[in-house]
Design a protein with these regions (language model features):
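A generic local secondary-structure boundary/capping motif
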Residues: 41, 119-120, 152-157
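ATP/NTP phosphate-donor binding region
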Residues: 1-105, 182-185
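Short beta-strand/turn micro-motifs composed of small residues
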Residues: 53-54, 110, 167
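A short, small-residue-rich loop immediately preceding and capping a beta-strand
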Residues: 99-135
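Short glycine-/acidic-enriched loop or helix-start segments at secondary-structure transitions
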Residues: 62-64, 117-119, 141-142, 176-177
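Glycine-/small-residue-rich active-site loops that bind phosphorylated ligands and cofactors
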Residues: 58, 81-85, 113, 136, ...
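A glycine/threonine-rich phosphate-anchoring loop and its flanking beta-alpha core
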Residues: 125-187
Length: 187
């Protein structure tokens, strides 16, 4: 199922105008296989230095597939033990980004934590990112805010939404039930 993002450009009941920067939302069985074709589109074809940010669990869940589909993809695989959307998670990803050097675009492969860390860096680096969620565990995949715990305090950082979301239902089906349940309660 391809979502027509233009349907979200209608006036909002809150009276405010909300900007939509997501070009594509694809939710389907096997959706991940569309990644190579999407990357060939004119808006992304010039992106030569792509980096995937994931953790060890999400690498197994979908990162290996992304890596196989995108030749030359560099990766940052974070340690999932005690990984949180906080200054430590941000610093771990930054270390990997610094080691890689030039980056044109990122691909977040994971759920809320990985997405918040990725969107934080994409905003700071002024580059786009793609979203490949591995579980329907949060409702904020297209958020423009990185919700973090910073030095022990909850804080919302201005960030960017992904330009493309590729939500593969075959991957979601394999996610732990507790993650899906947390997504239902996040709504």
């Amino acid at each position: 199922m391809k979502i027509d993002v233009n349907q979200f450009l209608k006036p909002c009941s809150c009276g405010r105008k909300h900007e939509i920067v997501v070009d594509d939302i694809i939710i389907d069985s096997g959706a991940i296989n569309q990644l190579p074709e999407i990357l060939k589109r004119p808006a992304y074809a010039d992106k030569k230095s792509l980096v995937m940010i994931c953790d060890e669990n999400t690498y197994e869940a979908a990162g290996k597939q992304v890596e196989a589909l995108v030749p030359g993809l560099k990766k940052i695989v974070l340690d999932p033990d005690n990984l949180h959307a906080n200054e430590h998670g941000v610093e771990a990803a930054k270390k990997g980004l610094d080691e890689i050097g030039n980056v044109d675009m990122m691909i977040a492969v994971g759920s809320g934590t990985v997405h918040d860390i990725t969107r934080f860096h994409a905003y700071a680096m002024k580059i786009p990112f793609f979203s490949v969620p591995t579980a329907a565990s949060v409702d904020g995949f297209v958020s423009t805010v990185a919700a973090m715990t910073w030095h022990g305090f909850k804080k919302s950082f201005t960030a960017v939404s992904p330009v493309v979301v590729i939500a593969d239902t075959d991957i979601f089906k394999k996610a732990p039930l507790r993650l899906t349940a947390s997504g239902v309660s996040d709504l």
